[in-house]
Amino acid sequence: MLSQTISEARSFLADVLDFVFPRHCTVCGERLQKDEQFLCADCLLHLPRTGLASAEGNEIEQLFWGRVDIQRAMSFFKYHSASNYHRILMDLKFHGKPEIGIFMGRLMARELVATRIFDGVDVIVPVPLAKSRLKKRGYNQSEMIARGISEITGLQIDTRSVVRTKANVSQIGKGRQQRQENVEGIFSVADSDALKGKHVLVVDDVLTTGATTISLISEIQKVCDAKCSVLTMAVASN
């Protein structure tokens, strides 16, 4: 009886808060229903998913061929700066909303777990941020996505074994070669024993040329015998 009363009180309070402080869809701006989070049902339905999880040798994996050795790679949805779905990344990276990263991580994991992309993975390594950017933002957006994935899959997150040793300038506006040069030597493996013999899932927010991820994986594979796969929330689309 008491538990039912508490549950009803919580539901009533949630209704009041939603009335006073209505929540809106990140993508379209429409008011969210009680059971919706961040994205309304329509925007969630039309999220431009890549559908690449079950396709070995897909276009995401091909970005890494001949550059680093990977097991699997895929991105969850396609993003373009002119699309309203760009707002997901903007809120996560620049508008101080880490919770949307956790939400997207959960969404990705729920939809992808049946594709077996997580099979054999031992640990998740979110791409580290430079200390200066972490201090400014207050959180690592890739770690937020990783947290959501971890909640659904049970995979552990390792934020200590790989560190970012310097802050590179923004990749925005740079070509492929410039991007690769910009990220050379920015990572270091602090604990190779923790990753030795493991299958590491590298998680990041958005994939463009793959330069940052390649730099990180190269550093891991220089110092320890580890398999690596890649999962990003989004991939830049022309």
Residue ranges, per PLM feature:
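Glycine-rich phosphate/pyrophosphate-handling loop used in enzymes and phosphotransfer proteins
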Residues: M1-V203, T208-N238
